[in-house]
Amino acid sequence: MLHKKYRPNVAAIIMSPDYPNTCEVFIAERIDIEGAWQFPQGGIDEGETPLEALHRELLEEIGTNEIEILAQYPRWIAYDFPSNMEHKFYAFDGQKQRYFLVRLKHANNIDLNKHTPEFRAYQFIHLKDLLKKIVPFKRQVYRQVIAYFKREGYL
């Protein structure tokens, strides 16, 4: 049996600064794939903890890591890359992720161009609209993680 290889990764479900009064999440459109909306995420570097990677990735991708950590998904969750994009991370079949639910402290600190841009646009959307916007191959993972945070009373 062939074992799949997954890239270790962190992902952030970022609630707006108005949370818990409003339940809107941050999504961003990838700069390299028009129409590909997702949560901020990124690889965990050698010797880095998932929490350290989360703070670094948020600073790199959205220009701020001023967040309050609300919760963490209790285990790693994986998805496979679609066959048409496997070349991007040729050594991996997909990614295994550690999800964090966080609240952004100040929305006006978001700067997609602070570092090398990975996103072209962002928006805060209501949870009910989330899965319609997200790239199809990530929907099952998003559905599972969101369901967990709902069961735990965060969403």
UniProtKB/Swiss-Prot annotation:
GO terms for molecular function: mRNA 5'-diphosphatase activity. Accelerates the degradation of transcripts by removing pyrophosphate from the 5'-end of triphosphorylated RNA, leading to a more labile monophosphorylated state that can stimulate subsequent ribonuclease cleavage. GO terms for cellular component: cytoplasm. GO terms for biological process: mRNA catabolic process. InterPro entries: Nudix_hydrolase, NUDIX_hydrolase-like_dom_sf, NUDIX_hydrolase_CS, NUDIX_hydrolase_dom, RppH. Its EC number is 3.6.1.-. Residues 5-147 form the Nudix hydrolase domain. Belongs to the Nudix hydrolase family. RppH subfamily. It comes from Helicobacter pylori (strain HPAG1). Its cofactor is a divalent metal cation. It comes from the Bacteria. A motif (Nudix box) lies at residues 42-63. Pfam families: NUDIX. Keywords: Hydrolase. PANTHER family: M7GPPPN-MRNA HYDROLASE. This is RNA pyrophosphohydrolase. NCBIfam families: PRK00714.1-3 (NF001936), PRK00714.1-5 (NF001938).
